[in-house]
Amino acid sequence: MPVSTDMLDGGVAVVTLSPAASSNTFSPDHFDPFLSCLQEVMENPSCRSVVITGSGRFFSSGGNMDDFSDAIENDNIGSRVQEMTDKLHPLLLRIRTSEKIFVCAVNGSAAGGGLGLALASDYRVCSPEAKLASAFFRLGLSPDGGMTWLLPRLVGNQVARKFFFNSEVWSAKQALDYGAVDELADPSVLLERAIEVARDWGRWSVSSRKGTKQLLDASTSTFFETQLHFEQSLMVASSQTEDFVEGVTSFKRKREPSFGSFEEE
């Protein structure tokens, strides 16, 4: 199977790409099952957080060169790329706006749309052996996968600009120093560490998780006054949930809160 899913305690779903899917993630044979798998965990009310990882040498290498070659020969490359991005981009948008926490355990090289998938997540734990590359310029393409929006917010506009225009390949250490990944973990504990983060971040309420993700993304492209109004609207809404009742009750009783509500996205 191109992809497998394991549900763990604490509401953590682990989605693992097979070695073949990791090296050719966005070929239809691999990407469609991957999309179906993520759709399933996103709609699972018992799932609070999702860990995505690959197998073998790659986390996700993005587009399949054989698919591109065939499409060029058949004179339908434009529609093929349109079809691929029509699937990928809504997925990335859902990851950014979902109430679920997404953590990527970057076990190997991430390139093209596969790098976009990692950058769209909330947290990235990276193997010291992994490498990050855009790959687009070497193919004569402009970037996709949300990278021109995501990467500048993590590393700054000029670092991102050099990454693309120099067609740089970052080591895991470089990616950590720039801020493109959050921490490095030995391959023997990489998945364990990613699950730990996913479980820890996923324990908070739906309103806290989803609202904060939305607010942080909005904060870089809006005025302060607008952001204050956005914060107010979300806080008023979240104050009327059972989770807020639990938060106040647990505070007064001096115990840890236990949030459990679920909202449709």
Language model feature labels by segment:
Residues 30-34, 84-87, 231:
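Hydrophobic alpha-helical membrane-association signature
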Residues 54-91, 110:
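Glycine- (often His-adjacent) and acidic-residue-rich active-site loop
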Residues 93-209, 237-241, 245-249, 255, ...:
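Crotonase-fold acyl-CoA enzyme core
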Residues 220, 256-265:
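Short C-terminal tail/terminal secondary-structure segment
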